[in-house]
UniProtKB/Swiss-Prot annotation:
Source species of the chain: Saccharomyces cerevisiae (strain ATCC 204508 / S288c)
Function according to Swiss-Prot or TrEMBL: Essential for the fidelity of chromosome transmission. Required for the DNA replication block checkpoint. Component of the RFC-like complex CTF18-RFC which is required for efficient establishment of chromosome cohesion during S-phase and may load or unload POL30/PCNA. During a clamp loading circle, the RFC:clamp complex binds to DNA and the recognition of the double-stranded/single-stranded junction stimulates ATP hydrolysis by RFC. The complex presumably provides bipartite ATP sites in which one subunit supplies a catalytic site for hydrolysis of ATP bound to the neighboring subunit.
InterPro entries listed in its UniProt record: Ctf8
Major location category of this protein: nucleus
Phylogenetic classification of the source organism: Eukaryota, Fungi, Dikarya, Ascomycota, Saccharomycotina
Gene: CTF8
GO BP: DNA replication; maintenance of DNA trinucleotide repeats; mitotic sister chromatid cohesion; telomere tethering at nuclear periphery
Keyword Cell cycle found: yes
Protein known as: Chromosome transmission fidelity protein 8
Subunit-level organization: Component of the CTF18-RFC complex, which consists of CTF18, CTF8, DSCC1, RFC2, RFC3, RFC4 and RFC5.
GO MF, one annotated term: DNA binding
């Protein structure tokens, strides 16, 4: 069976220093979002990305890929609110994962795997989006 070594040096650096910038996007670390349904992206997002102003910041580029910021996540204890655009919001609940999940970066060029972060929580959005009035 094929195998590959996993480099955990990045994870060790993150756990040894609180000052290092990480992939963590919430006070609870990197989180999984579980939503009902689909997020619909604009069909012409490439042209929208070219016209995006720095003030809006909806689009960015990383490793040659266009990334779309579709919302803003706010966490208050065990409750979470995801604002999607300027018209909808989702209300959700923060739950701890039974088994933490590792976030890995696979580099196919040199056949290496790097442990980037460990996810311990997820946010579950069970209901349909609510309109913002």
């Amino acid at each position: 069976m094929p195998s590959v070594d996993i480099d955990a040096s990045q994870w060790q650096k993150l756990t040894q220093s609180r000052e290092k910038q990480t992939t963590v996007i919430t006070p609870l670390g990197m989180m999984m979002l579980e939503i009902q349904g689909e997020l619909e992206l604009p069909k012409d997002f490439a042209s929208l990305a070219r016209r995006d102003s720095p003030n809006e910041g909806r689009f960015s580029e990383q490793d040659g890929e266009t990334l779309i910021r579709f919302g803003s996540l706010q966490i208050d204890g065990e409750r979470a609110t995801l604002f999607v655009g300027k018209k909808q919001r989702l209300l959700g609940k923060v739950t701890k994962l039974d088994v933490p999940m590792g976030i890995m970066h696979f580099n196919s060029k040199d056949n290496k795997v790097e442990l980037v972060d460990v996810m311990k929580y997820k946010v579950i959005f069970k209901d349909r989006p609510l309109p913002i009035m």
